[in-house]
Amino acid sequence: MENPRTTPTPTPLRRRRSERRARGGRVLTALTGVTLLAGLAIAPAATGASPSPAPPASPAPSADSGTADAGTTALPSMELYRAEAGVHAWLDANPGDHRAPLIAERIGSQPQAVWFAGAYNPGTITQQVAEVTSAAAAAGQLPVVVPYMIPFRDCGNHSGGGAPSFAAYAEWSGLFAAGLGSEPVVVVLEPDAIPLIDCLDNQQRAERLAALAGLAEAVTDANPEARVYYDVGHSAWHAPAAIAPTLVEAGILEHGAGIATNISNYRTTTDETAYASAVIAELGGGLGAVVDTSRNGNGPLGSEWCDPPGRLVGNNPTVNPGVPGVDAFLWIKLPGELDGCDGPVGSFSPAKAYELAGG
């Protein structure tokens, strides 16, 4: 990617946002195994700011519990769903590897998001999504799912692909939403689709924004318990005042619970929570944010976005982050899965996982 990063007021709309947040929310977890089932993970691109101090990563519990402060989160206080992923397959196959205990403790124990990417799959997507959401519901946990099928995805770079047309994407969107069930679920909407929109011409841009609004509407219509978060890039990319109008065009005020920042990137939690607050202020308030803390434990390495060395996992996933306006810290990118420079994008690297775990 050449752009920064990897892998959305009138009074009636303001009121509707408040009503949507008041319904309560859910935490997220991740099925890494479904990342394999669904396809690849996104590759971030980053520019900019030099690293700033990051808060220390929290201890590594296997479950999240507790009661969120009233009025501070759109998500319910639930355990995050931990699905099988590439890291678990590697751990199962390599129990004697000297790296395995640390990787298991710091990465394998944590809930991570489940991506639905790879090849266009209208015939199977409903079942794939339902397998995740039904397993999470049976466990009484909150899944985090990531639809990643927008046409012209990643501007044709490391994670290029997506649906063959916007008409095909509209069909896929309805089929994706049909698998969400009726229990709480976090949907992180199409990473990079808004931050990388400048690579499109005017017609493609309009079609993309309509498609994002259509997917968000399909999700919330199919499952009123779903919470949709729109990707906004990160703090060293688009200015809050610049990205906010695009989010509005994509339907965030009608269908969104909030925004997602730092997906597949390395920006510090401090920088990202401040950025999220500024974006939400530009949108008129009343929305929340989720921050991807999967690889930001010691911030970025300058402007390097693609498999930079020496990075660490950040704050553990939780729906009780203790930061006003932030609904959750999530591991949206799966630690140990590559950005595309040290190996195929989305492939699991035990060497990278061990490094991220502090080895």
Curated annotation (Swiss-Prot):
Stretches with biased composition (Basic residues): 13-24
SUPFAM superfamilies according to UniProt: Glycosyl hydrolases family 6, cellulases
UniProt biased composition (Low complexity): 60-72
Chemical reaction(s) catalysed: Endohydrolysis of (1->4)-beta-D-glucosidic linkages in cellulose, lichenin and cereal beta-D-glucans
pH effects: Optimum pH is 8.5.
Example of a GO biological process term: cellulose catabolic process
Keyword Disulfide bond: yes
Domain of life according to the entry: Bacteria
GO MF assignments: cellulase activity
Active site positions: 154, 192 (proton donor), 339 (nucleophile)
Keywords on record: Carbohydrate metabolism, Cellulose degradation, Disulfide bond, Glycosidase, Hydrolase, Polysaccharide degradation, Signal
Disulfide bond entries: 155-199
EC assignment: 3.2.1.4
Chain residue ranges for the region called Disordered: 1-26, 47-72
Family, as annotated: Belongs to the glycosyl hydrolase 6 (cellulase B) family.
PANTHER family the record matches: 1,4-BETA-D-GLUCAN CELLOBIOHYDROLASE C-RELATED, PTHR34876
Function: CMCase I preferentially hydrolyzes carboxymethyl cellulose (CMC).
Protein name: Endoglucanase 1
Organism: Streptomyces sp. (strain KSM-9)
Classification of source organism: Bacteria, Bacillati, Actinomycetota, Actinomycetes, Kitasatosporales
